Amino acid sequence: MSGMLGLSAVMGKRPKQQVTARPRKCPIEKPEEIPDDLLIDVFSRLSIEDVARCRCLSRFWSSILRRRYFTELFHKMSSTRPRILFTFLYYGKRLFYSMPQDLDPSNHYSPLPYFSISYSPISAHYQMHFPKVLGASAKVCPPILGLICCKSSKTMIFNPSTRESKFISTTKRVGVKSTSFGYDPIDKLFKVLSMSDDFVCRVSTLGTEVVTWRTVECSVPHHPLHSEICMDGVLYYLARRVGDETPKPYMVAAFEVRLERFKFLPMDLRCKHIGCSAVIDYKGKLAVVWLNVDRDNQRHIESFELRVLNDVDEVKWSQIIYELPNYWNNLPADIDVSIVGMTSAGEIVLATSHIRHPFYIFYYSTVTLAIVQLRIDFGIEAPEANHCSTMSTFVNHVENVELACGLGLSSIAM
């Protein structure tokens, strides 16, 4: 028997191995692709930071996030959560900060009737800065659809949401007196209006392959002043007629962005009011608002006075006055405030005019006549007196996800 086993071994026979049958693979079902419309709806609800991350995760996602439909939908969603934008020069750099515009009902305010003070400062969110090497801007136009126009050594367009900026080639003529920013909602075009020292007006359209400047006819030579707003395709700004030495040389210039033509709206605005006045959106109508102060004490604010434009064709203004309570003037003596705009809830917003500590903003409700005072913390040290620059504060700022390439201009990442 042993011989047989040995022979079997020599002949190379192997013992039988038990083979286990492999289970059949179940067919793998591929997940259904998510419809583009659903992706766009989800992306539109993300924060601007999350949208930026999604651009980097997938080329397909990035292509979706560049679509015009998504940009417009995100703007629509962002309009429901407007922000207040702050910008100022800080040792040569222009800084941008923002904060939610709507008051937080959970915040703890003092229980004074009709006058509330926030006990804790609100931290503003840092957005971007304007490099010192590019020059400092003296003029900052109000944001339109999240974009900001600044005039420095060159005119620049900023998008604080994407932290991009773009140069715009200036006119060949030197000595630009002023720069304004407008938007045409029909053709969906941004335009820059420029006025030279010889009062010649020119306009340029963003997004074109070659930036060109066109001369615009202007029948009334004028000096543009400090306040402007773009509403329904019309750029409004306060102005003073050149050579007019009458007590009322002021008016509102109205530039129709799409048709590129001027109209001038005379109004009753005196010299003593011009420094504390502003053009605002009052319930969908253009209005000019200013502060009435006590003759004996210029720091004592008595009321807000508004002129509301009821008829553009016949230039008819109506007057509204909101009297301020006496406790409004129980503020620190060194606070110098200016009107910065009006919210959709009917609140006139004022802010400290210069960057200093503490920095305040105020909400005055034209509905309840209540006042809320907030202290804002920018997380920086107070600048020295000779570096205490003017603060530009804007209401109704919305975030814009459009990248520089969408405007057809080269960008500088911040």
From Swiss-Prot:
Domain F-box: 28-77
Record-linked Pfam families: F-box, FBA_3
Alphabetized Gene3D superfamilies for the sequence: 1.20.1280.50
Domain of life of the organism encoding this protein: Eukaryota
Region annotation Disordered: where it falls in the sequence: 1-24
The protein's name: F-box protein At3g47030
